[in-house]
Amino acid sequence: MKPDVHIIGAGLIGLSTADSLLDRGERVVIWDRAPAPGMGASFSNGSLLHPSQAAPWIVDGLSEDLDEATRDELTANGLELAARSGDRVTRRISELGLPARKLGVMQVFNTSEARDARLEAYARMGTLAEPSDWFGHSAINIPGDSMADARAYSARLAEDLAERGAEFRMCADVGLAESGRGLVITCGAERETVGRIVVAAGNATAKLIKGLGLDLPVMGVAGHALSFLRNDDLADLPAVMHADSRSAMTVLGREVRLSGTVGLDSPGDLLPIWRELVPDLIEELGQPRRAWTGHRPCTPDGRPIMGPTPIDGLYVNTGHAHMGWTLCAGAGELVAEDVVAGRAHTPSRDAEMVPAR
């Protein structure tokens, strides 16, 4: 009998990896440092499923050095994985009995020139995009993007995994080591030797495997959110992305959520951005009921790191940045396929595992 597959990380990426492994007949044990699944970057993000945003982010100034051909290649790869992921997550949303995706996302710009330039970029990507207007701002309607509650999905998916036989072990100091017998998961003084491990612990992945001699170019970039109680007249508010600040406004059940990452020091920094865009709407929302900060796992070139490592039996699935919800189901499938096939790391994949990638 094959040994269980142990997954460290119970966020969207780890849960989705477990989901695909169970589909393939594997037994799964899921570890996390939080007291419950989905408590990290999956907890309060903008919940946008947005393949249109597959272009690599500029992180730590390094992505600016990518030439146009490389950026186009990375964008195409992201779009391909997003398409695969979208098909699966749509099916799983239905199977899990969750509300269907809310189709269509509006993207607003500070100037019409910026809007027109983005329309040209979307045309090159093959992304359907229509010029529009939102509260007097130049905008683009993106019919292929959508919204669904990422937190609700992770909670329901975790329940489903448990019902199908997955075992959850919550340990505040879960760690990873090596012994003469193989890989070892530690929890306090307890040690368990395991045969196959997927580390999908977001930005903590790099720290977890560093003791094994592996350096991953993964850094945590703070993401912030403010949640407001929604008035009834805002039920039909569309999901909106603000291009210049890379922030978003979404309606999730009885909440309106502002979320964003780049250039923000705290959740409160979201308010002046959206107060300038839609002052009357922000005034109507009143005081936020909850503020949240999490850390998205980002890589310098915007490309996630997925698959086998040079250590036999050790796999990683991380670095999805702002695309974690959009890519989780497809990324989980890809890594599950690697694990089931027992694929080994090869020299051609070394670039996936070193900071100079």
Predicted regions and their residues:
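N-terminal Rossmann-like FAD-binding beta1-loop-alpha1 element of flavoenzymes
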Residues: P3-I30
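Conserved Rossmann-like nucleotide-cofactor binding loop
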Residues: I13, A36, A204
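Glycine-rich FAD pyrophosphate-binding loop
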Residues: D23-F43
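Active-site substrate-recognition segment that forms the wall
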Residues: A41, N45-Q53, W57-E68, A76, ...
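Rossmann-like flavin
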Residues: L66-D160
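Helical element adjacent to the flavin cofactor pocket in flavoenzyme catalytic cores
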Residues: F135, A139-G188, E192
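C-terminal catalytic lobe of FAD-dependent flavoproteins
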Residues: G144, A150, D244, D280-R357
